[in-house]
From Swiss-Prot:
It comes from Caenorhabditis elegans. One of its GO terms (cellular component) is nuclear speck. InterPro entries: Znf_C2H2_sf (IPR036236), Znf_C2H2_type (IPR013087). One of its GO terms (molecular function) is zinc ion binding. Disruption phenotype: RNAi-mediated knockdown causes ectopic expression of gcy-5 in the ASEL gustatory neuron. Residues 1-36 are annotated as: Disordered. It is found in: Nucleus speckle. One of its GO terms (biological process) is neuron fate specification. Involved in transcriptional regulation. Required to specify left-right asymmetry of the ASE gustatory neurons, probably acting upstream of microRNA lsy-6. Involved in maintaining the distinction between somatic and germ cells, perhaps acting by repressing germ cell-specific genes in somatic cells. This is Zinc finger protein lsy-2. Residues 8-36 have a biased composition (Polar residues). The gene is lsy-2. It comes from the Eukaryota.
Amino acid sequence: MLTRRNAKQSQRNSADQSLSEFNSSSMTHGSNQSVYHHNQHMDDSEMMMDEQDYSQYQMGFPEEDEMVEGMMTPRAVHQCNVCNKIFVSYKGLQQHAVIHTDQKPFRCDICSKSFRFKSNLFEHRSVHTGFTPHACPYCGKTCRLKGNLKKHLRTHVTTKEELEAAWRPFASNRRPPADIPDDAIVLRGAGGPYYTPPPRPKKKKLGLGEPEHWVDKLRRGDLLPQVELEDKIRRLEDTIFNNMSLERWGNLFEIAKSIAFETHDCPVCKSQFMTRMDCVSHHTLEHENHREGLEFFCEKCYRPFADEASYNQHMSYHTRVSSLIETGEIVPQPADPEILVPTNDEFQMLFGANFGQQMMEPQLI
């Protein structure tokens, strides 16, 4: 094995041998070419070429960074083939593609409400937990959603600059949109799902036999307890007696409407409403084109049924009532029942003379 000194000596010998071969080949190159020999009296400094003169013979080899930049292929970006929005990564296109579908893969474990994005599910969970993580730095008020906190901050500041300064600690830390190069290659595509969608279970429709379903609704407080009519009237009387701001009959009727004699559930999202009209209005606006799973649906009661047998049994009740009305066995009550108007003496006894005069004005009845 050669030592380091022997290796250097061998490299020096090979260099001298190459130089001698070059000189011999130059001398015998041709008779027409002049051969210049080294003058023994020439100083070594004269043999050295000036650095400035030598620079003109250097070849312009590009630097490493210049080679990489020149040899790089144009960057590819991804464009949605539905709305033409451009994303710098395919992952971003996949996350965006769910907007153009009806898929809501992220479901709440408590109320089974579904969302398109996981961030929306995280915000929704605070409805059940009561967690209010966003606190106002001025008054300490806490908010469930960050957007509500920004609205609240406007009550403490007067200018836009102050609002931006107060909102800066709570602002999102997402990266700003990236600039798209001019020579970028645009790849159009649908993106496909970013996740593996689980099999969507069919929603269990309301039926007559499934006690577990009704027990769950009772535990969640979806069903109101059974209250006697006398208790409901007593609550209405207490509301009237404790509310001294009544001035018109219309106000009294509005208060009476708030008593929930019966609730109606939306057949799609199971939201509760006090009246059938509110339930129908909600279903028309929020679920206009959603008729999936409503094969056995009563339009009169606005309720779905689990199977055809339950639906037919329910519809037979409507048929029976209609036949009883046609035969005169049942007399339908008017839509607007008669109102028992108290006398002036009764109003004066309850609220005083001035209040009784206001309530008994003919144009307000």
